Amino acid sequence: MTAKYLPYFEDQKIKPFQNQSNSGQRILAVEAEHDLRQLTAEVLIDAGYQVDVAENGATAWSALQLSKYDLLITDQFMPKLSGVELLRKIYAANMTLPIIMATGFLPTWEFALHPCLQPVKMLLKPYSFQKLLGMVKNVLHTTGSAGVEIPLLCKSHIEHESAIKL
């Protein structure tokens, strides 16, 4: 039996999300769990974002090569290509989009210690949709369309080792 990390609701009443004008910002949401993937997409669409979904890192990588996104929200543990493996490919290709990684397994201290993962924002599962939307808004507001610069230490790490090692 596999564990499912669905978002939790902070109170009994489910509050509808206001459809705010988010200038059609495009988000790629990557989640292995079908129900969570669909719920996440619905919440983001209701908030005014354009959303594409992928069920694993390999599908996400294909989408990233074909389209431009303003934000990537990715799961960590997925079949075919994990979240960290997806980050390796993104950084090796010099893509600079902001990234939120949602996980219930990877401790945040591991991210803090690795220079390649410092631009990545962590969203620990289970999370509320309000927390997800708050983080999305914050990340998009602080980075805008410019994306996130890959840290210099990360660039040299990729050039010399071609990998992010955790």
What is the meaning of each model-derived region?
Residues 1-26, 130-166:
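Non-catalytic signal-transmission and effector/linker regions of two-component phosphorelay proteins
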Residues 38-46:
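Charged docking surfaces used in two-component/phosphorelay signaling
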Residues 48-55, 63:
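Short hydrophobic/Thr-rich beta-strand motif most characteristic of the beta2 strand and flanking loop
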Residues 55-59, 82-85:
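Acidic catalytic/metal-coordinating carboxylates
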Residues 67-73:
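Active-site beta3 strand of CheY-like receiver
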Residues 78:
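Receiver (REC) domain active-site loop signature in two-component systems and cognate sites
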Residues 85, 106-124, 130-134:
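Alpha4 helix (beta4-alpha4-beta5 surface) of REC/receiver domains from two-component response regulators
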Residues 102-103:
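Hydrophobic/aromatic residues positioned on beta-strands within the core alpha/beta folds
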